[in-house]
Amino acid sequence: MCEKARVIVRMLQGCNSMKKLRKIHSHVIINGLQHHPSIFNHLLRFCAVSVTGSLSHAQLLFDHFDSDPSTSDWNYLIRGFSNSSSPLNSILFYNRMLLSSVSRPDLFTFNFALKSCERIKSIPKCLEIHGSVIRSGFLDDAIVATSLVRCYSANGSVEIASKVFDEMPVRDLVSWNVMICCFSHVGLHNQALSMYKRMGNEGVCGDSYTLVALLSSCAHVSALNMGVMLHRIACDIRCESCVFVSNALIDMYAKCGSLENAIGVFNGMRKRDVLTWNSMIIGYGVHGHGVEAISFFRKMVASGVRPNAITFLGLLLGCSHQGLVKEGVEHFEIMSSQFHLTPNVKHYGCMVDLYGRAGQLENSLEMIYASSCHEDPVLWRTLLGSCKIHRNLELGEVAMKKLVQLEAFNAGDYVLMTSIYSAANDAQAFASMRKLIRSHDLQTVPGWSWIEIGDQVHKFVVDDKMHPESAVIYSELGEVINRAILAGYKPEDSNRTAPTLSDRCLGSADTSHSEKLAIAYGLMRTTAGTTLRITKNLRVCRDCHSFTKYVSKAFNREIIVRDRVRFHHFADGICSCNDYW
């Protein structure tokens, strides 16, 4: 390398802006060194990879280079575009590289290309690159294999991701974290928790990222025991003070029904961000503690943290679940007037629900028409649910008609309307709606419930016969129902009381709804006085709500149920929702 070239390379190594680079580039051209491989490589590297670089300038440099680019030259552009707002360009340069007669992809090329595939959500391209990785002999490389797992995971191909992971000869911590995150992200929370146990059996210790992914899964299935164990591990590896770990702990405790522990974590934090405050406000909201949510909101604003759209979602949830109509309206208004945030369909849905629960159905209808998303089926479905609660046939038909116009075919809507007709004793309309359900072959979402016993999470579905202890569970359930009846439980007519997308109700004392099976199993497998914590994917029906109240009284147990709508804390025959849900 000549002296001029060495001087220019040193200048490029110290370059920190495009303004300086352009000056250096002009010297390169004046001295006729624009095609010098080392100088070109340094120019390209800064433009493509540096934070202050320019991908458009990098592309111009690349396209005007007379010689054959090296593998590292291709990698700079593929890498640069993989991190940009145009990841598709990264794939286009990867394709061009494959057509090159000189340069071949290396493990860095595959990593950058797979990252782009992950971002553009292209399974065919991922499969194609996977084949190239195998042919190139890089599949045994932990970094490349992990990139494949991450790419398949991002595209929803969990089975392929799991297969690639299982076939890896060497798995590092990053590989385990990616696989755990994959299971957690797609809702396979039991698999995520099982993966952690497998990880421990292979002698791999987790880090803060492992814990955050696992805490998310614990939150979804209400695995409090597992969550508490992970909290201890966070303390042992001294990462509990990390804001994102503390936020995950607050979220987990709140969603597992342990607000006291969530508050404990919050109070112990030295630093808090908007997610910290949001986790607490939403936690109070879903537990029906609207007053406390508002109090936390005021503390948040006073501490100088600016609320965002999620903050107000938690506030409105709390107001809706506690019947705080006036307060809900006030905070909905200041969302835009004081904090300049634009409400979205979720905020409007909360307002429709707020008015609807309070019986102000006309206000619900006005809110829908006044919103910018009045064509969204969610709002009309929410109104329909309120019409069912308050037996308002007229507005129920308005909401149902609109849902049909929007072609928002949902079995739950028809079930709701059927219940409304049944409550109004309109036999003809009831029969017509049932006929529509059968003719369209509409299937309702099956109800399922989770309960954690020890470190194991058990899942039950309505009329479940798949559990290995099924016979014993049904026998226990019969005894539990009898004791609940002695305590005052009266099974309700499901046609009159079934809520939105509830389990299929049979209207008899031995109805085998998923939460009833979970409660029976919990009573079987825990000692007297142990709190039962159950998570349900649908809104709990009135019959099961009544059943759980009397079970808590008959067995002197606290039972915490998290359904699709909110938390219910049952104790001594009383629910924390005060039958307002």
UniProtKB/Swiss-Prot annotation:
InterPro entries in the record: DYW_dom, E_motif, Pentatricopeptide_rpt, PPR_At4g14850-like_plant, TPR-like_helical_dom_sf
Region feature Type E motif, mapped onto this chain: 379-454
UniProt KW keywords: Repeat
Intervals holding PPR repeats: 70-104, 106-140, 141-171, 172-206, 207-241, 242-272, 273-307, 308-338, 344-378
Region described as Type DYW motif: spans on this chain: 486-581
Stretches for region Type E(+) motif: 455-485
Disulfide partners: none
UniProt superkingdom: Eukaryota
Biological process terms in GO annotation: RNA modification
Family under the similarity heading: Belongs to the PPR family. PCMP-H subfamily.
Protein name: Pentatricopeptide repeat-containing protein At3g56550
Species: Arabidopsis thaliana (Mouse-ear cress)
